[in-house]
């Protein structure tokens, strides 16, 4: 009887606790489900990005500091200037990620160009232009430029003031249909400083490396959620991975590649359950190096049947690759996190529906890691060329990295965390109500 009485007295508080927990679990479940629909998310800018306004001339250019990330914007036909104060020993790398706003239209030749110039408008080591390409689908694209210290072809070798020039490129309005949107693009600027070597070495690129196309990995794919920007990229290692991607969506992944290792990747877009037609460039996969410099990209058409695209063979990571004239080789000059960026054209929805569509990534990292070059100082940020930085990265058959969220990205884990905090808070409150109610029932009525 005592036990029955206790359960009867606790019945109402238990009901309260159960009701609250069920409601909270339902809310958490709906939040997680919403995160898993594959709905395109806006670009995830670095949380610590400093807002900065580009100047229309060099006189008012704002100084950028190494190791920092900045957020700016670039208008139509825009040309903006930012200032660098450089020494005579370090290499400076600047990358600008252009992000068209939702609903924008872009043409094949629309893009962003980045260069570093001296006080006489002379271009320094390199400048690049990133285009949206044949997909004509708005998505984040990044271009990079540098001031490098070295012999021969290198200019801008002295310490002093230099300028980053970010330009918006476009074809004449009369040559494209529909015309590009005049809206401003958001910009994310990153600045990395690389120290000189302790001892000067070779100044020519390696002439011999294994350029045969590697076999794509086989095996069951494990789920891994891509991020919505460079700073939220999902961690991958060697293995077969799967995700979902919706038309108009861009997914970011990062893969650690050490000195002497050779990277390769294949992306596969799964078959559609309906629709018809053909798109010449539906899926685009791009590879960026640790300073967000474009190394290579590849595209694939789509007719509703499964399609795949593989990067052309890349050389092992070597310091001396920088002396090559081919971007695909010279870009593989650093150890660190390499970024796989996958975009599915928005126009796919018109022919095959809103998705999400199945995406499989087959990632290889061949070769043993070797000791890197002896730098005379530290890079800024200091861990940018360290592939072991951060959470342990999963390899085929290995462990899922801590903090990566397993098969989910940071957004889902934040939702789970918020749900967990909410559940815990409500549980504590409910238990408090239960305790008070139980004490009142246990107290003699004459009290």
Regions found by a protein language model. Give the residues of each.
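N-terminal export and membrane-targeting signals
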Residues: 1-19, 410-422, 437-438
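Surface-exposed beta-strand/loop patches in noncatalytic accessory domains
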Residues: 69-71, 103-145, 278-315
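A short beta-strand element within beta-rich, extracytoplasmic domains
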Residues: 91-103, 263-272
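Noncatalytic modules at the cell exterior or secretory-pathway interfaces
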Residues: 90-92, 151-175, 261-263, 329-347
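C-terminal membrane-anchoring or membrane-association module
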Residues: 418-447
């Amino acid at each position: 009887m005592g036990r029955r009485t206790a359960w009867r007295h606790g019945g109402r508080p238990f009901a309260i606790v159960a009701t609250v927990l069920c409601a909270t679990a339902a809310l958490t479940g709906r939040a997680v489900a919403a995160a898993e629909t594959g709905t395109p998310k806006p670009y995830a800018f670095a949380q610590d990005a400093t807002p900065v306004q580009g100047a229309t001339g060099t006189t008012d250019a704002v100084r950028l500091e190494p190791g920092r990330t900045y957020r700016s914007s670039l208008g139509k036909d825009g040309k903006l200037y930012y200032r660098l104060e450089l020494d005579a020993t370090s290499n400076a790398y600047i990358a600008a990620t252009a992000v068209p706003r939702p609903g924008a239209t872009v043409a094949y030749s629309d893009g962003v160009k980045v260069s570093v110039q001296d006080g006489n408008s002379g271009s320094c080591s390199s400048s690049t232009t990133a285009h949206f390409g044949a997909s004509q689908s708005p998505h984040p694209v990044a271009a990079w430029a540098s001031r490098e210290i070295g012999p021969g072809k290198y200019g801008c070798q002295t310490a002093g003031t230099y300028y980053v020039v970010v330009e918006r490129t476009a074809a004449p309005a009369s040559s494209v249909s529909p015309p590009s949107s005049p809206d401003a693009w958001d910009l994310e600027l990153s600045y990395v400083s690389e120290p000189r070597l302790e001892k000067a070495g070779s100044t020519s690129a390696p002439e011999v490396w294994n350029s045969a196309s590697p076999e794509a990995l086989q095996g069951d794919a494990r789920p891994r959620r891509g991020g919505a920007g460079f700073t939220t990229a999902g961690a991958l290692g060697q293995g077969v991975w799967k995700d979902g991607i919706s038309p108009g969506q861009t997914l970011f992944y990062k893969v650690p590649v050490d000195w002497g290792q050779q990277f390769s990747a294949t992306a596969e877009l799964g078959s559609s359950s309906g629709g018809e037609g053909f798109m010449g460039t539906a899926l685009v996969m791009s590879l960026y190096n640790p300073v967000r410099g474009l190394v290579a990209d590849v595209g694939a058409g789509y007719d509703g049947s499964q399609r795949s695209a593989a990067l052309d063979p890349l050389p092992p990571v070597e310091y001396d690759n920088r002396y090559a004239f081919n971007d695909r080789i010279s870009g593989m000059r650093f150890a660190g996190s390499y970024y796989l960026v996958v975009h599915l054209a928005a126009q796919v929805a018109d022919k095959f529906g809103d998705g999400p569509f199945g995406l499989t990534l087959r990632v290889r990292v061949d070769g043993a890691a070797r000791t890197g070059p002896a730098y005379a100082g530290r890079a800024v940020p200091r861990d940018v060329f360290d592939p072991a930085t951060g959470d342990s990265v999963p390899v085929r058959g290995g462990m899922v990295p801590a903090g990566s969220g397993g098969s989910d990205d940071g957004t889902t884990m934040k939702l789970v965390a918020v749900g967990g905090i909410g559940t815990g808070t409500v549980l504590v409150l409910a238990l408090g109500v239960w305790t008070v109610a139980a004490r009142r029932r246990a107290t003699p009525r004459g009290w």
